[in-house]
């Protein structure tokens, strides 16, 4: 069972799983099985499960939990980013909260997010390779150059930077580029990593 199935399980229109007993191990999981598996996955990968469930609007509580997990991670790694590490306690905490909140929102974006769908590939992540299409005489596709194959645009990091600048008025462009941006990007990447960990654990406990 993969995390995608968790989203389907919570959809009222999904007929995929029920509370009826399974005839064989290969049959669809029952509702009880799914809830038990989710509980096990949450105990081992709480960050990833919260991030995924929050992203898919399964729980508002999970959204806040995911941001809290991300803030903990940010505090843990902030020492690697000099411009952030040297901030005073209260200011540093507020900056990390801002970065974690915006980074999680970036992670949550998809082609279904209003205004985020790539205008070149219309959310498919694929585009026509004109040169090869002309060369081969048939349609040849390639990764969309605008969205890099994901089908949507990332949240503009400038919004996070503006919020940080309100907390650190004297933040310079070099400091932002060398410390704030790398930390922000690391937080977004961590969300995807934690989701992948949760996905693997959920798959393992439902085999």
Identify the residue ranges that each predicted region occupies.
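Transmembrane alpha-helical hairpins and terminal membrane-anchor modules
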Residues: 139-145, 153
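Long, charge-rich boundary regions
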Residues: 148-207
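N-terminal alpha-helical interaction blocks
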Residues: 1-108
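Short, flexible, mixed-charge glycine/proline-rich loop motifs
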Residues: 101-117, 125, 134-139
